[in-house]
Each structure stands twice: as structure tokens, then as C-alpha cells.
Amino acid sequence: MNGIRDVVKEEQPRERLLLEGAGSLSNRELLAVLLRTGSKDETVLKLSDKILHHFDGLRMLKDATLEELVSIHGVGVAKASQLIAAFELGRRMVRLEYQNRYSIRSPEDCARYMMEEMRFLQQEHFVCLYLNTKNQVIHRQTIFIGSLNSSIVHPREVFKEAFRRAAASIICLHNHPSGDPAPSREDIEVTKRLVECGRIIGIEVLDHIIIGDHKFVSLKEKGHI
């Protein structure tokens, strides 16, 4: 016997990870490492397959709720909590790269900063990035969750945080859960209202970015700002 090398089999993804590295594992094997054990009826890899099939792959799984996970036979609160915590850590690690006073020089910079966090959201989220005079992000805040319209997104809520943070300018973003970032009439109306308020109080609204699935639209580039 040669120790750990002799126990590397298909049903032992953790041992494969130790010997070959995490990059060599499939999605089902990585999920099995997080789950640690299967149930009395199935192996951990079979449980991984069932979870991935239930959510049609990683895209939907990463946003799974506790209730959705525990509805799967073999997944209890402990396993569900482990998965939710792992996915949240992954999201935070993606953000970490950009959080150290990330500078925004173009709509592409802004979309890159928020794309992975916003493109899979199941509801519309209206988010503001608050910038200093060097166009560095000093704060961001979700202002509203739900269908965007001018009666709900109130300038008071947008600019209140700008004053608190002594922001020089603002970039607004929201996502389209459909994946299509084409602006609606309401999107344009909200944008024009915020831009006008910004002019009056001296805090410029630089852009309004609509996030789709790996696509975005800048309302400034479209001529609406």
C-alpha cells in the first residue's frame, strides 16, 4: 500500500483534491467535497448529481435558498448551510478584487465591477456607486429591490447617501433578470429625473448601467445622460 495514493478512487473526491489539486475535480466532485458525506441511500457523488440536476447546474444552485436545498432528499440543514456559506464566500472573493478603491474610467469598468454580483439576481436591484473626485468607489448601496419606476426610486434616497459619504458623483446600476439589458421607458425616465436632481444639488450622475447576462447597456452612451 502506498498510503493516500492507494485510496484514490472515483468515490473519493477529497483524496483526489489532496493529490491533484482542486482544479482537477469536476463540479460534482467539488460539490461532494463540500457535502462531505452522502446519505444512507446514496453516495456523496450521487447526492451531488441529484443536487446539480435539481438546479440545472451551478448557475441556479449558487442562488439556492435554505428551503430549496433541504427540500432535496438527503440534504439537511447542516449540508444546506455549508453550501450557502461556500457560495457566499465565493461571491465575496470576487468582490474583494475590486473593493480596494476601485477606479471607474468607463462604462466597461463599472459593468466589470458589478456584473458577477448582479447578472443572476432574480429581482431587479437598483444600486448606487458613490465616487470620490478621483472616480474611485468609496461606497455602494442597494437603494431598492423590485420593478423599477420613477415613483419608487426617489432621488432623496439616492442622494442622502451621497451627502453622508461626501461623494463627488454617482453611478446608478440595475439588473434585468431576463438577461436582456435593453432600457425600458421607465429606465430612461428614472435616469433623467436623477440626473436633473444631481445637477440641482451639485452631485453629478455619471451614468446609469443596466446589467444583463454578460451584457450591459450604458444610458450615457445611448445619449440619455
UniProtKB/Swiss-Prot annotation:
Residues 103-225 form the MPN domain. Keywords: Hydrolase, Metal-binding, Metalloprotease, Protease, Zinc. Zn(2+) binds at residues 174, 176, 187. GO terms for biological process: proteolysis. InterPro entries: MPN, RadC_JAB, RuvA_2-like, UPF0758, UPF0758_CS, UPF0758_N. A motif (JAMM motif) lies at residues 174-187. Pfam families: RadC, UPF0758_N. Belongs to the UPF0758 family. This is UPF0758 protein BCAH187_A4587. CDD domains: MPN_DUF2466. It comes from Bacillus cereus (strain AH187). One of its GO terms (molecular function) is metal ion binding. The keyword Metal-binding applies.
